Regions:
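Conserved alpha/beta core of the MobA/IspD/sugar-nucleotide pyrophosphorylase nucleotidyltransferase superfamily
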Residues: 2-6, 158-227
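Residues at the starts of beta-strands that form the adenosine-phosphate
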Residues: 7, 52-54, 101, 128-129, ...
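Short, conserved active-site loop motifs that form the nucleotide-linked donor/cofactor pocket
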Residues: 8, 74-76
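Acidic helix N-cap motif at the loop->helix transition within catalytic regions
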Residues: 63-69
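Conserved beta-loop-beta/alpha segment of the NTase-like Rossmann-fold superfamily
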Residues: 76, 84-144, 161, 166
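Short pre-catalytic strand/loop immediately N-terminal to key active-site residues, enriched for Gly-Thr
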Residues: 76-79, 154-159
Length: 227
């Protein structure tokens, strides 16, 4: 294994308001096992020697709260954008270390493992841009207006997760191209931006533990993992 220490930065988009969760505070600030959701993945990245720095993009109205609640020498908190990809762009532009690569991870995936993060780092160095994804286990249907159109071979389907990773220089170049010629769609992750511009994106196998916290039902399931 190569020496990965200090070669990577992390950007953690935490700007969503989690409307599907309900409540009056962002879901990333809700307590999970007595600790705010965002702290789980944030602390995992901060603990890793591979990480040179971590930037977290948060809602503008909550920036002071985050800064008062948690600080770390490797952590910088910035204001997120209107869309997730713009929050990531703000985070990437705020990086100041000598790191070559960036891993983007949703704080709503609190149980990402250090093993998966290291697998992403290794894949990024040996192959190129990559994302974590888990293989589909259910039969996948394409439907329109409530009517099934066709069935997809699930062996070719992967459910995207995070981290998603690329070189910092590459992402900055692509953000520059978007500024010059805006996209005709709203990307929901970094991989879709890379794909749009013809970049190869490799898969790192994920797992159920790395699923995203989205609904109140998810919250109950995730809370049971902290007991």
């Amino acid at each position: 294994m190569q020496n990965l220490n200090g070669r990577f930065a992390a950007v953690l988009p935490a700007g969503g308001l989690g409307k599907r969760m309900g409540g009056n505070i962002p879901k990333q600030l809700m307590l999970l096992g007595g600790k705010p959701v965002y702290r789980y993945s944030l602390e995992t990245f901060l603990e890793m020697e591979e990480s040179a720095e971590v930037v977290m993009a948060v809602p503008a109205d909550w920036k002071d709260h985050f800064e008062k609640e948690f600080s770390h020498p490797k952590l910088k908190i910035v204001i997120g954008g209107a869309e997730r990809w713009q929050s990531v762009e703000n985070g990437v532009n705020a990086l100041t270390s000598s790191a070559e690569f960036v891993l983007v991870h949703d704080v709503a995936r609190p149980f990402v493992s250090k093993e998966i993060i290291r697998d992403v780092c290794e894949t990024l160095i040996t192959k190129g841009s990559c994302l974590v994804a888990k293989p589909a286990v259910d039969t996948i249907k394409i439907a329109a207006d409530g009517k099934v159109q066709k069935t997809i071979d699930r062996n070719t389907v992967w459910m995207a997760q995070t981290p998603q990773a690329a070189s910092i220089a590459l992402l900055k170049k692509l953000y520059g191209r978007i500024a010059a010629e805006p996209l005709n769609f709203t990307p929901t992750d970094e991989a879709s931006i890379l794909e749009y511009f013809g970049e190869n994106v490799y898969i790192v196998k994920g797992n159920v533990a790395n699923d995203k916290l989205t609904t109140p039902e998810d919250f109950e399931i995730f809370a049971s993992r902290t007991r």
